[in-house]
UniProtKB/Swiss-Prot annotation:
The keyword Cytoplasm applies. The gene is rdgC. May be involved in recombination. Keywords: Cytoplasm, DNA recombination. PANTHER family: RECOMBINATION-ASSOCIATED PROTEIN RDGC. GO terms for cellular component: bacterial nucleoid; cytoplasm. The keyword Cytoplasm applies. One of its GO terms (biological process) is DNA recombination. Belongs to the RdgC family. InterPro entries: RdgC. This is Recombination-associated protein RdgC. Its main location: cytoplasm.
């Protein structure tokens, strides 16, 4: 249930859609399985096996975007097209021209697509209508952009803004390391990266290794800035903050994994319990993280 990598956005206006309205919007762009004539297709699927495209609980909304991509190598298309071209050459007495060859490849692609294997990738979206967050569980910006693109078509207008803070994460993290002191309710863990801003982009990394403060200060004095920093919030959630304000490798600590009711809960109850826990904890983490970066910047 827990999102691992957070791409963080702000809802720029109060959420106006009720459950039925949201479901209707999502249904227009639902994933259509079995469409064999597209190399790639996108659409919304149910986050659970209950058929609804949005799972809503106490103002928290969970969505899932499915991306399907057909595996049809160009070499295969070219081989089949070449064989077809030879047959046509024998029939008409001369080689197919460039335009005809293009048409042959298009026909071959259409014929092979229904037989091609597919790979699927699901990306989850959490909309917090109470605290006005929109969070995408994606490590890469391209995947987040894919979600935002379809979401903007699904909900028009989409009340969404990027998140801006007063102090850049790189400057803040560098300051925390130099002072050997994390902001209130946070602690610094053992993974970090410092990188030079010049052409060399020289970097020093600590990976699961105690951070030598004096060594780090020397690197900072030489012009390096912290670009990644592993931290723990409230002894409850560990994560890595990046210079681009992404939150990666999110993991609940043992204190949050203990659920005395788990043995008596059915699957639906367990899902809702996990969702309530994750959304509640991460919403508080994000609020305190933004505060530690000087607060939200209005642009």
């Amino acid at each position: 249930m827990w999102f691992k990598n957070l791409k963080i956005y702000r809802l720029s206006a109060p959420w106006a859609l009720n459950g039925d309205q949201l479901e209707e919007c999502l249904a227009r762009f639902a994933y259509q399985g079995g469409n064999n004539l597209e190399m790639q297709s996108l659409g919304w699927i149910s986050p659970r096996e209950n058929g609804l495209l949005a799972h809503t609980l106490n103002g928290q909304i969970l969505l899932t975007l499915r991306a399907e991509k057909k595996l049809l190598p160009t070499t295969v298309v070219n081989q089949v097209a070449k064989a077809r071209a030879q047959e046509i050459e024998e029939q008409q007495g001369y080689k197919p021209g460039r335009k005809q060859m293009k048409e042959i490849k298009e026909r071959v692609t259409d014929e092979l697509l229904p037989k091609a294997f597919s790979i699927y990738r699901d990306t989850r979206v959490w909309i917090d209508t109470v605290n006005h967050w929109l969070v995408i569980d994606a490590a890469a910006s391209a995947k987040a952009d894919e979600v935002i693109g379809l979401l903007a078509k699904t909900i028009d207008p989409l009340p969404l803004d990027n998140l801006y803070v007063e102090q850049s994460p790189a400057a803040a993290m560098t300051g925390w390391l130099a002072a050997d002191e994390a902001p209130a309710n946070f602690s610094i863990d053992q993974d970090t990266e410092l990188r030079a801003s010049g052409e060399s982009r020289a970097a020093i990394r600590y990976v699961k290794h105690s951070i030598d403060v004096d060594d780090v200060r020397r690197h900072i004095q030489s012009g390096k800035q912290c670009t990644r920093l592993a931290m723990t919030w409230a002894d409850r959630v560990s994560f890595v903050l990046t210079e681009s304000l992404d939150v990666k490798r999110v993991a609940p600590l043992d204190v949050l994994k203990e659920n005395p009711d788990a043995a008596t809960q059915n699957d639906d109850e367990k899902f809702d319990s996990d969702m309530t826990l994750m959304t509640g904890e991460v919403a508080k983490l994000l609020a305190e993280l933004v505060d530690s970066l000087g607060g939200e910047k209005r642009v």
